[in-house]
Amino acid sequence: DNGGGFRGNHPLKSGKGSLYEGGIRMPTFVRGPGIKMGSYCKVPVVQWDFLQTFYDLAGGREPLPADLDGGGLRDVFEKGNKGRVKRNTKELIFHFPWHTGMAESVIRSGKYKLRKDLDSLEMELFDLSKDIGELTDLSGEMPELVRKLDRKRSAYLDSVNAETVTLTRRNYVELLKGGWIENGKNRLAKLKAELSADPDNKQKAFQVGVSQNHVDFQDRQIERSTRLIKMHEQRGTADK
């Protein structure tokens, strides 16, 4: 899927829903002709490499669109750590403008990884060759590299017209106000009426509690998203 849970993910930091290594680093297992049994490779690959890989292995001859993000993995399969993945961008970029959680964006270049919080705009720099747990932030020691990587990250996101977190939050708020909240409150009112008629019904009482929590959560999400949208507008900053 996309990373382990927040517990038991050592030595990786964080887990699902995060762009720290605990949320994006996953093992990949491959077997087939030309692949040495029991071999191990440290070359980073990503899911969007598989399209070109499968096309190549299936014998595709016609050129694929030039603007594809990924690259073929045949060279890595056959040569291991000596193999290379040819992509349009040398860096790996992960962009997660999450409307209900921690909005963040990451660029990895070689052994270095820059993570940017899209709300606070704070950035962290890690050397993954020495610090896979992302415990030591090097941004203060290497400010030029931070600026360089952030410019590359931003330029790439602009080139693919990536969504901003403000846009995803606006769409989310409109979706909630467009029917989700009303439907949730109507269901809650119906369940409360049924429980009032049968106050000893434990299952119905449980359903009321779950429904109430869901309605309260959506109300909090609208409040949070609206507040953060206003913050970005007042600050006049890009949020990608």
Where are the language model's segments positioned?
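A generic structural signal for short coil/turn motifs at secondary-structure boundaries
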Residues: 37-40, 135-137
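Long, internal low-complexity/basic segments
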Residues: 50, 109, 120-122, 128-240
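Tryptophan-centered motif/residue detector
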Residues: 31-32, 94-96, 221-224
